[in-house]
Structure formats: structure tokens, C-alpha cells
Regions:
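Sec-dependent N-terminal signal peptides of Gram-positive bacterial secreted proteins and lipoproteins
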Residues: 15-23
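Flexible, low-complexity junctional segments that flank or bridge functional domains
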Residues: 32-401, 406-408, 413-416, 424, ...
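Conserved acidic, small-residue-rich alpha-beta core segments centered on
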Residues: 306, 312-315, 394, 399-401, ...
Length: 582
């Protein structure tokens, strides 16, 4: 079993902010409007439309012209309108002749055109305001090869990056490690830490590197586990094994050994499912769902997982038992305890599938094993709720520090798993504008985004400090705007945030703007469908949230000391938050 607060590992961040109308009260245009610009519909483009670099640029420009939501604001950062971009760059792309990269051109000519095309696209995209936006473009490199290049805006230089996993040990040492703290870095890079500060009793620190709370810190457990029913069609016991062995194995000696091995494997499974370890884990998992005492959930689930038969740990986790018999047979191949049984192929085939059917259909093993393994791999399922949300609800957390530094965003549903407890009044936290139709400068009015009080609200304002850096993006920024809408008890500290609050959807028919997906095999767009302003009307895209307490950028030496947990290291952001909340 792992030691919760001491886990250290890698991280992966930057998930996009996805729209959830149930949370924000936003409305979406129900369908894409007719193309008033009389251009070809985006979905109608195909590879036959791209025969040259000029064609490639034409398709790129047309998609942006129809779907990009921020052309009107581009004038603030560029001396060119979008039409002027076309007039300057269309002739440049037309002058590149080697898109077909045939033997009519030398390799050097192909690669020179490749370099120019990349330069031109980067010059255009450098001025893009939207910080979620990127485009992948496939270009010829030689007579027989292509490359796909990702182009992002470099409009704003982002330097302040302070991810939680890098300063994990230093921050952990600021917390009371008396059983009230929790922390974890999961195998897929989710990183979270929470606990009371040693120097400031009642002040709680919570930091995480991406908004993936729902998938890591919550789980819907069953109301009960591991039923048994001897009358089930799928019931398996020693007598059935004996009967089938007599039917399928003629050699008495081989039959006896095969029967013994099969019966022993079944007994091992039954003994485990009836064990105290499994029972205690089941009790805590059901208690989590039934609002009972689930303390010790992680420890007991880990114990039950670790003592489980090795075969269970080798099998794929799936609800479908079809073909599971073959999976069992394959996993047993290397185990000397079952070779006599496996050598009787007809019996082995029957037995392995019968065992799978019994475990999956009568004992409902999938539900138990899936939930047990999830808990084993996510100690924060217990920690986030028992050591953060419950003390918060009880009023034990008097002040709160939220560390969003290095947090690139994630799922919008996570807002409800944090902010719902801290919202005490309905408030407008932002304004959103979308495309009204496919004309480049046709927009909806600015639509107010409201956060409302839910039944989870604590009904009291908790002094809160939010730590930000240049890589606090997307949902980190939206969550900050939501909490800031609640009043002056919420303060922000650090550097300007990333500046990426626009909304994304994978449904390209849901709105008149934005596009996620390919347009021909040469172009892949990742384009938001909206633009966001804060409650005061400030455009934050590419600018970011300016903190209430703007700190000087951390030096390389400062960061290195914090990363190495040097005795002289000082986290100025955390220190400032503690001063403000004192």
C-alpha cells in the first residue's frame, strides 16, 4: 500500500475548458446558420480542394474566416485585418510550387518551400489572440515524405510556471502530517495535495495540477457487492466440475489431476471473495455511497487488492464476460499449478468459461473488482471528501488557500465539486460572445454567465487566497472568476494567469463558431467557439487575470531551492497568501 502524502511522480496538464450549460446557464445556438458569406461549407472541403500551397492557405483562411470568433479583436494586436492577411499571404503561398513534391522538383526546392510555408503560417498564427487555439498542418518535406506541424500563438510570452509536483516535498512540509492531510500523484499524472498549514491553524491548503477531480476524487460505488446464488444458471461448484471432467476426460489419472486443479482454483476464488479482507473493503465502499462511515476506505481496499489471487490482477477489467474464459486460460498458461487441467483442452475450455460466467454473472465480480481497483489507484477518493469537503462543511476550515499555479484546466464539471460549496450569492462572473452566423464579424450580444447558489453551499464566506501563475489556464481562470464574483474575501496572488477562457465543444454543429477536427487531411483545427470577458468587461484572452497582489517573477535560483526542498527555500506566493489571511 502506498504512503499517501509522500507520493511523488510526474505530471501531465492542460485540459480544455468544456461548456456545461447546466452549470453556467449559458445557451447554445441550436444549429449552424446558413453560410451568409457564400463560401464553401467547412464540412464540404476534401483533399481534392488542396492541390497546391495556395489551395492549402485558401482552405485555412476560409475556415478561420467563417468560424474563428475573435477576428474583431485581432485589430488590437495586429495592424492587419483578416482580409489584409489574405491579400499579403495568398500571393506568398501561391508562389510556393512544390506542394505535389514530384520528381519535377529537387529535394532542396521542396524543403525550401516547406520552410517558407511554416514561416508564413507561424507569422499569421503568432497574432492569434485565442490561447486555446492551435492548428496542425501537414506539409511535404521530400519526394516521399510529409510532416505534420502544430502551430500555436506566441502572442504572449509565458515564463512563470510552478507545477505542484515540482515543489511537492517543500509544500508537503508546510502541512500538518497528523492524519488530516492527503496527497497523491496518480499514474496518469493527476496531482493533488491538501492539509492544514503548520504555521496557521485553521488555514487549509489545497493544490492540484489539473481540473480532473471528478475522475480521480469521486466514485460511484455499488449499494452491495458479491452476491451468491446456488440456484443460478451460472453457479459453479466441485460437483459440477466432477461431472464435466467425467464427460470430457477419459483417462482416469489425468481426470483426477485436472479435476483437483480446477476445484482448487475455484476454492481459491471463493475463499478470497468470502474473506474478511474482501468483506471489510465491501463494507467501506458501500458506506461511501450510503453516507456511512467510510474512514479507512483506501487502506482496507488496498489490503483487499493486495491479497487477491494473482489471476484477478491479470484479467482485463470489463463487464463483458464473453471471451473471458479464453483470457483466463491464457493467463494460467505460465502457472505450473494448472498444467494438468490445461492439457485436457476440451475440459479446460469448458472450465475456464464456466469459471468466468460464475464469477461475472453470479458473484458479479466486475462491479467489486472495478471499484476495488479504482480505489486502490486513487487514494484521494477518500482524502478529498473526508479530509477536505467534510471539514469544510463542518466549519473546521476557517481560511482557504487554493493553489492553481501550473494548473492548465480540465473539465467544467469540476467547478461544481469545488465552487458549489463556496458560492453564497448568485452573481455574474463573466460574459460570453459567440458567432451569430458564418460571416466573419457577425456576433451575438455579450451573454452574462451567472453562478447560482446550490444546496451544497456552506452559506458563509470563507477568506480565500488563490495562487496563480502564467500557466494557470482555462478552468483555473474560470474558477477564479467564479470565486472572485462572491466578494472581497477572495484575493488572487502571483502572476497574470494564462489567458485562455474561451469555450470548446467537440460538436461542430452545436454552434456557428469554432471547430475541432480535420478539414481535409491536411488541416486539423482546435478552435474555441466563443470569447470571454470578466464581470468588469475586461477581455482576458491572451492577457490573463491580473492578480490583486502581483508578485515579482520567481528567479531560477528560487525555484531550484523549492524543487530541492532546500532549508532556505521560501515560497513567496504561499507566504503572501498566509500574510493576507492572517
Amino acid at each position: 500500500m502506498r504512503t499517501p502524502i509522500y507520493i511523488k511522480g510526474g505530471m501531465r496538464c492542460f485540459f480544455a475548458f468544456l461548456l456545461a450549460t447546466t452549470t453556467t446557464g449559458m445557451s447554445l445556438t441550436s444549429c449552424v446558420a446558413d453560410n451568409d458569406a457564400n463560401e464553401k461549407s467547412i464540412s464540404d472541403y476534401s483533399d481534392t480542394d488542396v492541390k497546391s500551397y495556395g489551395d492549402l492557405f485558401q482552405v485555412f483562411w476560409s475556415v478561420m474566416n467563417q468560424r474563428y470568433c475573435t477576428l474583431n479583436e485581432q485589430s488590437a494586436v495586429s495592424s492587419q485585418t483578416w482580409d489584409q492577411v489574405y491579400k499579403e499571404y495568398k500571393p506568398k503561398f501561391d508562389a510556393l510550387k512544390t506542394f505535389q513534391h514530384t520528381s519535377a522538383f529537387t529535394q532542396q526546392e521542396i524543403q525550401e518551400d516547406n520552410a517558407k510555408a511554416k514561416q508564413y503560417f507561424q507569422e499569421i498564427i503568432d497574432k492569434i489572440i485565442d490561447q486555446h487555439f492551435y492548428v496542425k498542418i501537414t506539409l511535404p518535406v521530400s519526394h516521399s515524405s510529409m510532416e505534420t506541424v502544430r502551430f500555436n500563438s506566441t502572442l504572449r510570452n509565458k515564463t512563470e510556471y510552478f507545477p505542484l509536483n515540482a515543489h511537492w516535498n517543500h509544500t508537503r512540509d508546510q502541512l500538518n502530517l497528523d492524519g488530516t492531510a492527503f496527497g497523491e500523484i496518480t499514474s496518469d499524472g493527476f496531482c493533488i495535495m491538501g492539509g492544514y498549514l503548520k504555521e496557521q491553524p485553521g488555514t487549509y491548503y489545497l493544490g492540484f495540477n489539473k481540473f480532473a477531480l471528478y475522475e480521480n476524487c469521486f466514485h460511484e460505488y455499488q449499494k452491495s457487492y458479491l452476491p451468491g446464488n446456488a440456484a443460478s444458471t451460472y453457479h459453479l461448484d466441485a460437483s459440477k466440475i466432477t461431472d464435466k471432467a467425467k464427460e470430457l476426460i477419459t483417462d482416469a489419472g489425468k481426470r483426477e489431476k485436472a479435476e483437483q486443479q480446477a476445484a482448487q482454483l475455484l476454492a481459491d476464488m471463493d475463499n478470497y471473495l468470502a474473506s474478511d479482507d474482501a468483506a471489510k473493503a465491501c463494507e467501506k465502499m458501500t458506506a461511501y455511497s450510503n453516507q456511512g462511515d467510510y474512514s479507512g476506505l483506501y487502506a482496507l481496499a488496498s489490503q483487499a487488492y493486495e491479497v487477491a489471487p494473482g489471476l484477478l490482477k491479470l484479467l482485463p477489467i470489463t463487464a463483458d464476460a464473453s471471451g473471458m474464459g479464453e483470457q483466463i486460460r491464457q493467463k494460467l498458461q505460465g502457472d505450473t499449478r494448472y498444467q494438468q487441467m490445461l492439457s485436457a483442452s476440451s475440459f479446460a475450455n469448458w472450465y475456464c468459461q464456466a469459471l468466468a460466467d460464475y464469477l461475472w454473472h453470479e458473484r458479479e465480480l466486475y462491479a467489486y473488482w472495478n471499484d476495488l481497483k479504482f480505489t486502490y489507484n486513487h487514494l484521494c477518493v477518500e482524502g478529498y471528501r473526508r479530509l477536505f469537503l467534510e471539514p469544510l462543511a463542518k466549519g473546521e476550515i476557517k481560511k482557504l488557500i487554493l493553489d492553481f499555479r501550473g494548473n492548465g484546466g480540465g473539465s467544467v464539471i469540476d467547478t461544481r465539486l469545488l465552487t458549489d460549496y463556496l458560492i453564497t450569492q448568485t452573481a455574474v462572473y463573466a460574459y460570453v460572445r459567440k458567432k451569430e452566423d458564418n460571416n466573419p464579424y457577425s456576433y451575438t450580444p455579450w451573454i452574462p454567465q451567472k453562478i447560482t447558489v446550490t444546496s451544497k453551499s456552506l452559506g458563509r464566506n470563507i477568506p480565500t487566497a488563490i495562487l496563480l501563475d502564467n500557466y494557470s489556464a482555462s478552468m483555473s481562470e474560470v474558477t477564479t472568476l467564479i470565486l472572485k464574483s462572491q466578494g472581497d474575501h477572495v484575493k488572487t496572488i502571483g502572476r497574470n494567469s494564462y489567458g485562455a477562457q474561451a469555450m470548446l465543444t467537440s460538436d461542430n454543429e452545436a454552434s456557428n463558431g469554432g471547430w475541432i477536427g480535420n478539414v481535409t487531411s491536411y488541416l486539423y483545427f482546435y478552435m474555441p467557439f466563443s470569447l470571454t470577458k470578466d464581470a468588469q468587461g475586461n477581455l482576458l484572452e491572451s492577457v490573463g487575470i491580473t492578480t490583486d497582489y502581483l508578485l515579482d517573477e520567481m528567479t531560477g535560483e528560487e525555484k531550484e531551492k523549492l524543487y530541492q526542498n532546500d532549508a532556505s527555500a521560501v515560497d513567496r506566493g504561499l507566504k503572501k497568501a498566509m500574510e493576507i489571511l492572517k
